[in-house]
Amino acid sequence: MTLFMGGRLAIMTMPYEVIAENGFRDGDLGTLIDVARSVRGVEVAAVVKQLTAEKKFRASLRSSVDFDVAEVAAEFGGGGHTRAAGCTILAGSIDEAAEKLQNAITARFE
């Protein structure tokens, strides 16, 4: 997990290699977002997962403040609600996907 914006944003990544080696399924990873949200000071949390070897990355976003994560998800063709949303990010690597998400969030954060 990496913290940004003085600890207000937390982004966790789960690469395909880790998922495949451990036999995880998408449903097994649902509580990761809660780990990121539990860090003191985190207002927006995201988990980026690579579920297959393809260069498609699924992101889950949550907000504990008046920050519309659905707007961020919509930028990548996703959707959801103000405080809970998701999307698929196309990128060359999981780090690139996380960086795209970080940039989209920080651009909207006040």
Regions found by a protein language model. Give the residues of each.
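Hydrophobic helix-and-loop "lid/oligomerization" segment in the mid-to-C-terminal part
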Residues: 1-76, 81-110
